[in-house]
Each structure stands twice: as C-alpha cells, then as structure tokens.
From Swiss-Prot:
This is Protein nucleotidyltransferase YdiU. The keyword Methyltransferase does not apply. HAMAP family: YdiU_SelO. Belongs to the SELO family.
Length: 481
C-alpha cells in the first residue's frame, strides 16, 4: 500500500517532537474505514480494507512514515501546564490530498509516549467511535473539523474506572496538529527562536500569503483570530458544545479538534454543560465565545516578542487584534443567524429579531435544531412552531416581524442551512452501546444520516427526534480519546 508521505513537520522542526513507535497490539481488526475520505487523500480504499488493520494499529506502518509524538503545553481549565504533548497519539506522517492540501495522519490510542504522564496511552472503543461519528457529523454540517480515516479494534482489554473495556485506535486526519499550546510550550521556556520557527512553519503551511505581509507574525495572529472566530460562531449556530476548550485543544488551522466530552445541545439553555469534568461550567455553551477570546489572548502572549522588539509596542499591537475578536465573532454569528432565519439581505433590526426568538426558545427550553428547522414550515403556517415554542401571542408578533424580512424561496433556503439530523446524545449512546455488543449497524445508520444532515429521508424519522424527557438533564460526557 503506497502512501506518498512528505513529512515537513519532522523534517523542518527537529526538537519539536520525540520520535516514537506505536505499542504492539495483539489482534488488530479494522472496524470501519472512511472510504470517502480515503479517496480524498488519494488512497486505495479497497487495499486499505485488506491492509488497514496492520497500518492503522501501527503494527506495520507504510514506507515513508515517520511516527512522532508532538510537544505542546496548554491552559487546562484556566491553569497552565507547561508540558503536555501527545500522551497517547503519534503523528505518522503527512500526505497531500487530491485538492493539493497537506494533511496530517495521526494514530490516537497507540500507546505510551514520553508525554504520557503516567497514563497508559490507550483508547477504548466507545470514545474512538464517538470521535469518528461526531467528526463526520461536523463535516456534514460544513464546519471545519478533523476527521477519522479509520477505527481499529486492538484485541486487548483496557482498564478504566468502569472496568475492562475493548481497546481501539483512531486514525485522525487534520490540516495539522499545531495548537495554541504548541507555541506556549516554547514560549514558557523563553525559547523564542523556536517560537519564531514554528510561526514561520505555520504561516507557510496554513497562511502562505502572509509571508509577504509587512508584519507577518501580527498578520498570522490576526488570521488565527479570524479563523477561530468563524469556527466558534459555526459551533454556536448548530448548538455544538466542545466541552474542553483548553488552549491545547485549539488548532491554529481553524479546525475543530479533540472531540472529548463534546455534545450537541437540545433544549436551548446558554448554561448547558455536559462534560463530567467541567464542574464550574467554564466551557458551557454560552461561554464559548468568551473562551475563544481568552485562548487567543494566551496565543498573543506566546507570540508577543515576535510582534515588536519593544514590549510596550508589542502589547499594543496584540491588544489591537484581540480587541476585534468580539466583533469578528458577532459578525460571523449574525451572518449565520440571518441565513438560519431565511432573511433577505441585512438590516439593523436583525439582531433584535434573532435575540427575541432566542429568548422565547430559552423560556420554553425549545429544541435548538427542530425550532430552526420548523421555521421553513412557519413561513406560511402559524402553527408550525407551537409544538416547540409556548406563548402564542408573543410568537404571533414575532412571526409577523420575521415574515416581513423573508426573501424569495425562504422555506427552501431555511432547510438548506438548518439540519434535520444532528448527533443527538441518546442516539450516539445507542450506537456506541450496540457497537460494544458487536453490532455496528446503528453506528452506520447514524453516520449515513449525519453525512447529509439537511436532507430529510423516509425511514430516519426517529433520528430527528429529541431525547426522551429528562435524558439530557442527567447526561454526562467524558474525555475518552
């Protein structure tokens, strides 16, 4: 099996990683191959079906692979950890896809590395399939994301608090795995030469036009801020909660990365938290835009000496960029909300129109996804929103204001941007429970729906329905991969 590796990170950034090998596993078995993604990468899916168990378990890596564990630091729940790094993952190499984009291939759950900090470096079946599924859901929604190329069962039990669980390894594809925390690792050691080298590499890889900018490092900071503001706005528009927005989980590329305790909100409440470790609600749904700015401030601190030799001027330049983050986010969010509402053009009252609907939704704990989807029917039917929203008098007033702002073919345009299918928590859990019992049918069915979430299909009605009453109130997610 031929992989056309061109491993620029290993070649150009020696000292930013540790060469390492995957731990041996007893009986690797390919559970699922993302054939569509394999095609995008220029790989032979049929051959991968035959050889993938050995390749994607790390047992027999292709020629040209260069397995390594990347170094990074990070703020975790606000506290700084100067050394984190890939504790259970190995970057095995980089390939160029059919569109000419450089993509990382990484094994997650491949065993201990020098960054494991006492952990076993393994992953279990449930979290691996969960990341596979949610990544594909985000891709289907058009949100920048890492994706899973393959899931492999290792054939070995992995000891966790709940007992022995089946081991698994995920092959993750990403634009890169450069994180805010990668810069922090070297900045914390006052190694500004390596911070500069990393910035040069990141610019060349992700934002090559900026190399000619008058102040390329400041332009890079602004580009990352813009990409992340766009990303978080997209999360908010679909009700996605990342769950662990630590700086080591923020990618410079602007992709969603590290699907640990993530989940989709159903009943609208800005305070929604599902993560079992987010006891204070730091990463609640409604806090995500604020954490976006907080994390970008930490990136600015790491890059500060690159902005100007004078510390005062450097801080002024960083703060000038940081001061725009809220406006960047709000502009992207409002643009997306106009699309969700089917509005024609842009008018000054659009923000209040959106906020009034959200207030009604919050009061009723209305299902985020179904409410916006049903707006398509509400274009002509007053009763369309009543199953999800209370207060018909208030609703009628809002409907009148909203309808005056609608453009042509509003119902079609609303359906085109508001999904009917999301990775609802109870359906994800059902699919994972079935997989643990040896049945991947529900997983495949859910993936099939989520790959085209805007098209309603007969036979999938159950996947569009909210969880049973009370399910999400007690639902908790965990960091598994």
């Amino acid at each position: 099996m031929t992989f056309r590796f061109d491993n620029s990170y290993a070649r150009e950034l020696e000292g930013f990683y540790v060469d390492w090998q995957a731990a041996p596993v007893p009986a690797p078995r390919l559970l699922r191959l993302n054939r569509g993604l394999a095609g995008e990468l220029g790989l032979d899916a049929d051959r991968l079906e035959a050889e993938g168990a050995a390749i994607f378990s790390g047992k027999r890596l292709p020629e040209g692979a260069h397995p390594l564990a990347q170094a990074y630091a990070g703020h975790q729940f606000g506290g700084f950890s100067p050394q984190l790094g890939d504790g259970r993952a190995l970057l095995i190499g980089e390939v160029t896809d059919r569109s000419g984009r450089r993509r990382d291939l990484q094994l997650k759950g491949s065993g201990r590395t020098p960054f494991s900090r006492g952990a076993d470096g393994k992953a279990t079946l449930g979290p691996v399939l969960r990341e596979y599924l949610v990544g594909e859901a985000m891709h289907g929604l058009g949100i920048p994301t890492t994706r899973a190329l393959a899931a492999v069962a290792t054939g070995e039990p992995v000891l966790r608090q709940a007992g022995e669980l089946p081991g698994a390894i995920l092959t993750r594809v990403a634009a890169s795995h450069i994180r805010v925390g990668t810069f922090q690792f070297f900045a914390a050691r006052s190694d500004m030469e390596r911070v500069r080298r990393l910035a040069d590499y990141a610019i060349a890889r992700h934002y090559p036009a900026l190399a000619e900018a008058p102040e390329p490092y400041l332009a890079f900071y602004e580009a990352v801020a813009d990409a992340q503001a766009d990303l978080v706005a997209r999360w908010m528009l679909v009700g996605f909660i990342h769950g662990v927005m630590n700086t080591d989980n923020m990618a410079i590329s602007g992709e969603t990365i590290d699907y640990g305790p993530c989940a989709f909100m159903e009943g609208f409440d800005p305070g929604t938290v599902f993560s079992s470790i987010d006891l204070q609600g730091r990463y609640a749904y409604g806090n995500q835009p604020f954490i976006l700015a907080w994390n970008l401030a930490r990136l600015g601190e790491a890059l500060l000496p690159l902005f100007d030799a004078d510390a005062g001027r450097a801080a002024e330049k960083a703060n000038a960029v940081l001061g725009t983050v809220g406006a960047r986010y709000q502009a992207r969010w409002l643009e997306g909300m106009r699309a969700k509402l089917g509005l024609a053009g842009a008018e000054e009252g659009d923000l209040s129109l959106a906020e009034d609907l959200l207030a009604a939704m919050q009061g009723a704990r209305a299902d985020w996804t179904l409410t916006f989807r049903r707006l398509a029917d509400a274009v002509t039917e007053d009763a369309a929103l009543r199953p999800v929203l209370q207060g018909p008098d208030t609703l009628q007033s809002w409907l009148s204001r909203w309808r005056r702002r609608l453009g042509p073919e509003a119902a079609r345009r609303i359906r085109a941007v508001n999904p009917i299918y999301i990775a609802r928590n109870h359906r994800v859990e059902e699919a994972l429970a079935a997989a643990h019992a040896g049945d991947l049918g529900p997983f495949d069915r859910l993936i099939g729906a989520l790959s085209d979430p805007f098209t309603e299909r007969a036979g999938l009605e159950d996947l569009a329905q909210p969880a049973p009453a009370g399910f999400n109130e007690g639902y908790r997610t965990f960091c598994g991969t």
